[in-house]
Amino acid sequence: MLADPNFHRSVVYLIDHSEDGALGVVLNRPSEIPVGDVVPTWASYVSEPRTVFVGGPVSPEAAICLGRCADAGDSPLWNALSDEIGVVDLNGDPLLAPGGITGLRVFAGYSGWSPGQLEAEMDMDGWFVLDAEPADLFVETAEELWRRVLARQRGPVRRFASFPEDPSVN
């Protein structure tokens, strides 16, 4: 596991991973900042809790928005990442967003890795690499997401779901 406090019990959704590096957002770090204070035009569309999430330590002044939509069509505000998940352009008018959005989350900053850095951390067992479920991105109780993701796994990794925060006081 990584010693970096930015990633302690973090669930990171990778948005991009290539030979140029990797970029993702932390899904389970809600802030107390209301989305309406940052991007007021999108506030009513955001999933509960309607706060900005801390996406990571890189560029905390930048906002990234992920959405869930079964059929985004050819909306100019949608950049598909998978069948249901995409990046939403917060500079656009929410009325031009694809219909059928069932989840929206705004992140301040992101998590970034230089070429080969994430792979090296994975080789040192610094990360569990697991499949995401679309609902993971939009849970209301994000603080429980780390345990929930691990608990649904098969095999030894599942045991970490009940691992104490500080094993030395166990």
Model segments located where?
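A short aromatic-anchored loop/beta-hairpin motif
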Residues: 1-170
